[in-house]
Amino acid sequence: SGNRHKGTMWWQWAQRAAAILFIPLLVTLMLQYWGGNEQELAQIMEVKTNPGMMTSLTLPDGTLVYLNSESTLSYPSRFDNDTRNVTLQGEAYFEVAKNPEKKFIVSTSHQSQIEVLGTHFNVEAYEKEDRISATLVEGKIGFIYKSNDVSKKVLMDPGQKLVYDSKDNKVQLYATSGESEIAWKEGKIIFRNTPLEEGLRMLEKRYNVEFIIKNDRLKGDSFTGTFTNQRLERILEYFQLSSQIRWRYLDSPDMKDEKSKIEIY
């Protein structure tokens, strides 16, 4: 009876596998029938995250990607060319599979790119923002940007964070442990002497809200702390205890607004 049970399980698995494989196989056979020996073209895949949500995925070459809130990653179903090209709008953490023969290139907004062979790094490049940042955890990357229509490359070492301002066309490098920049993929928010504006930007992405700072004097405040799966109100209460900050939810006159607005005063 044990062999019969194993045989039944195998047959059920085979049926499921056949169901999964059937459509791709049918498409391949049709392409071969109509297109002779022409190879099937790689499809462009796109993964999007909703506000306040995160996801992870594995690319065809084995590269692991964590995608942050309101982000989009586009990539081919196969890396057939000499380079592995993906396009990012938003924020992602990459653990790139090593392949010395094929560079891994991340295209971002403002005609900039990040070029790697095999490494771990974080990229923040939201289309609506003028700022792009890259934090290198392991390996080596090159940040490529255009200045007066000339391509320039900045090489980075582990423990460095690059910030590119597309308005001023300036690049700055900072030393960092990377702890704060990549905490989001573990569901954490880490502030390390983080300025108020930067901290609020992090909270906007995580909780799908919009902050309005009414008191400019508060912009000089900075905060240190670690939060794991905390309610937004709990974090704002911590801000309130640590400084003179006060906050309140605003009623939106536009019912189409998807984001709650919070005034900092």
For each feature predicted by the language model, list its residue ranges.
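A residue-level detector for the "anchor" residue at the start of short, highly conserved motifs
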Residues: 2-265
